[in-house]
Curated annotation (Swiss-Prot):
It catalyses: RNA(n+1) + phosphate = RNA(n) + a ribonucleoside 5'-diphosphate. Belongs to the polyribonucleotide nucleotidyltransferase family. Residues 625-693 form the S1 motif domain. Mg(2+) binds at D489, D495. Keywords: Cytoplasm, Magnesium, Metal-binding, Nucleotidyltransferase, RNA-binding, Transferase. One of its GO terms (molecular function) is polyribonucleotide nucleotidyltransferase activity. Its cofactor is Mg(2+). This is Polyribonucleotide nucleotidyltransferase.
Amino acid sequence: MSKQVFEMIFAGKKLVVETGQVAKQANGSVVVRYGDSTVLTAAVMSKKMSTGDFFPLQVNYEEKMYAAGKFPGGFNKREGRPSTDATLTARLIDRPIRPMFAEGFRNEVQVINTVLSFDENASAPMAAMFGSSLALSISDIPFNGPIAGVQVAYVDGNFIINPTAQEQEASALELTVAGTKEAINMVESGAKELSEEIMLEALLKGHEAVCELIAFQEEIVTAIGKEKAEVELLQVDPELQAEIIATHNIALQAAVQVEEKKAREAATEAVKEVVIGEYEARYAEHEEYDRIMRDVAEILEQMEHAEVRRLITEDKVRPDGRRVDEIRPLDAVIDFLPQVHGSGLFTRGQTQALSVLTLAPMGEAQIIDGLTPEYKKRFMHHYNFPQYSVGETGRYGAAGRREIGHGALGERALEQVLPSLEEFPYAIRLVAEVLESNGSSSQASICAGTLALMAGGVPIKAPVAGIAMGLISDGTNYTVLTDIQGLEDHFGDMDFKVAGTREGITALQMDIKIEGITPQILEEALAQAKKARFEILDVLHGAIAEPRPQLAPTAPKIDMIKIDVDKIKVVIGKGGETIDKIIAETGVKIDIDEEGNVSIFSSDQAAIDRTKDIIASLVREAKVGEVYHAKVVRIEKFGAFVNLFDKTDALVHISEIAWTRTANVADVLEIGEEVDVKVIKIDDKGRVDASMKALLPRPPKADNPKKES
């Protein structure tokens, strides 16, 4: 196929799609140019079905540093493992695409997005999401798309689609919404305590823009799309299915209705073992033994899936006996750990998270060096999910995509209420350790994080709580669930996480397993989540009503002063001479950023105060109208030079010494004498003029008697 080009204007920027020129051996490939961002997307599919019990979809988002004209860091000077941002973007693309493949699809699919050129004002992640959907749609891979995604900002009461970096900086909302032309199927958001009404409007505005992109994709697919390949879907033997349902469904239904998680798991596992043992014995010598046993396992999974959904939609009964809008028992504890800078333990039913706070000087902030300009990240929220939290053995090692994603969600939820750097000059790290899990552990980590911050004396603006909402839908009727547990998450249609304060929402995340949900469901889920959030906030308030007025004794003492940017070199000195001298004299640690924020760290408050005084004197400038207690340092015929402070001198002209005429400066002033002066002028060369007489009472004018005529 020869090169073909398609164009449209979207959100004020040119969107160009090129096909048929590069990566032609992939099942589908496109080059997407949006503004000056360029992304190559290639989609490939294995020829045979995999043997696993899940759909092996892999989505990658590869940031090439040359795209921003930068060298990679490190010794080898080449790209290594994906950055956190790249991992989160890959998840962002995966989530709306995954539901668009047929049930039982087991061929491996890889979608590789490579950022070739980066423009921070034209979203490369959204270009990659568009390219991923389009590459799959024009290929022969059986993909039930297209989908598309956009970013939405909220500035001065207006919604902006795919904002520039400057617009996003000013925005109260950072939202990514994706979906089909019929409905939304993925949401990721951070917000500055926005109302449910504004969030819902933002979602709908975003979906309108999504529909524009989908219409453009449909035009391209009509023009160049390939015929879809015939692939084998994982389907069970219907006769075997009917037989197992007839003989074992009642026993499995009873097991599913056991309320306590561990007891329920044991009961369902016992039923499954009986069924599997029966069929292993019957078909041990059968030539299709592996296929039959795979079908048996799949049928049992489908039966459990069907019973959980039936209970909720028909009987309005949840597996643990709760009402559809009922939260599991809650508990909140602070100061769980000694020595640390703050800690909180939050429990919701059989889900439990321990959050631990660590404070440090800004020199410990994380340096982010990606495609965007390098910056320091002050707040970090890390999430760990050990396998013992669900009573299982498993892999231990570096954080995976899921842990990185859950940590980022908690980070977005909590960073909206953190004090500014000027108010609280610390780098802040929260680590959430999931100790037990039966669903919604990411939201438990947010609640535990709030407890740890407040217990540690971080002056947050308001406590934040999170809740996970679920959905069971049969296409006609639906039920929205509050505080979903693991079974409801696994067999349900939606995982909709909402975090916020009493004033509004600070984070949203939604993933669904069906093709989309309606505005009505979104509105209902947000309303139920608000009610639940307030209930959880009451429990957090019971544990700690407000942030402690002081830090933990083990926390470092840090103070910060702001200096003019052009004074940074004065504090540092030639070759660091000045700052090294200050550190040697006071014993503190000092960190200065490029904006003039000076952080001073020590265990001794007196040393911090002494350092602040030294730096203040170094950067001090004379100001017109201010009064100084000065010392005479030089006398000339035309006036006296006085030292105001440090290396700043001023001239007191002979006419500014007194209101009466001064014949000789040396008659009224001597070197070393201390006098009060007022600055009256600073010229464009920085020379300072001061006055002594301006501080003295002006003598009355002498009366001039009138002459008699």
